[in-house]
Amino acid sequence: MGICASVFLLTSCPSGIKTGVKPSSVNIGSKSSATGISYNQKGGFQVDKKFSGQLTGPNLVFIEGGRFTMGSLEEDVLGMHDNVERTVSVQSFYMDETEIANVHYLEYLYSVQKDSTQDFYESALPDTTVWKNDLAFNDPYVEQYLRFPGFRMYPVVGISWKQVNDYCVWRTAAVNQQLAGSDKVKEKKPKKGAATAGTAATAATTRTNTTARLTIESGRVLPSYRLPTEAEWEYAAKAMIGTQQEDENQINQRIYPWDGPSLRQSQGKARGTMLANFKRGRGDYAGIAGKSNDGAIITTEVYKYPPNDFGLYQMAGNVNEWVQDLYRPLSFQDFNDLNPIRRNEKLDKASRYDSKNNNSLIDNKVRVYKGGSWSDVAYWLAPGTRRYLDEDSATATIGFRCAMISAGTNK
């Protein structure tokens, strides 16, 4: 009997794959399983047969997606009722292991200053005056925090939501250029006075030679770095994967990114030590000398405390983190239950908007931030809590980390 004579073998023969093996995204075969036409012939359809799965970008950790209960498990002490518990699912994705540190942002500023316009460089600078306070002597941080080597691995602060998105555009292009091996490509600096709109990627996108020849189809171009959605961030912070036993039933929920109600290590040699950088109470940022609680008066290094069960550091405390979502107090009513996000579009009936007498602080420019900071009490360390700020504003308590889709795989 010929190999292709049997009916049950016909489906595997045209693909050029070993008998009995079905084509997959990483083992596509030498021929189309739909037409039988060979791939990669001269003048024919080309596929990259070296593809073995999405590359993991620098600093990224894989987060296996799934179902979880989104929303705050803490008592709603402010009476906001803006994060009611509901069940949603998120697709697998990648997230930065740590918050973006000062040294990472300085790398970005160096590239922008070298390859972009002066106007855009100035617009990318963090607002270091966020440390100023009329009734507090924080002046040294204004000059030292961003650039002094002792703060290199402290989270960058004083950056707006818009600045963060520009950083993500640059980082995507810079990482893909590095992966393409085109570091030595000669670049052109934009002419003085050129338009600055959309120039976040100028520092990397002007490197067009090798990078431009790589396409999405090659599998060697990473998807875009971006801010995580609120659902992704909360899912990654809770890290309920650490509570799984024999089946998919979750017996316990988590208030914080770790088990239990305590903010201290409950066992081992580190028993009694703090698990996050936060403010214990009025005037108490770190305890007393010799018996420091969390070991940090302001922010601290991004690897300071133990990671959660996904391997992510500082998902509670240190600095709050921007997420993609627009803030709406009733987002839970509008959310899709798969990969939910709240965008700028108006979802309510037009009759419900009063454009003439709109005095609310909530508009299409306010963005959600989460996680709690060095200046927040423990209540805000719970992943389900949420606050908002104008996308053009910045504070000394908000930083960020990036995320990326996991294309074509859930594990």
Residues covered by each model-derived region:
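Bacterial Sec-dependent N-terminal signal peptides
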Residues: 1-23, 236
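A short, compositionally biased domain-edge/stem linker segment
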Residues: 40-56, 208-215
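Short loop/turn microsegments at loop-to-beta-strand junctions
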Residues: 58, 223-224, 306-310
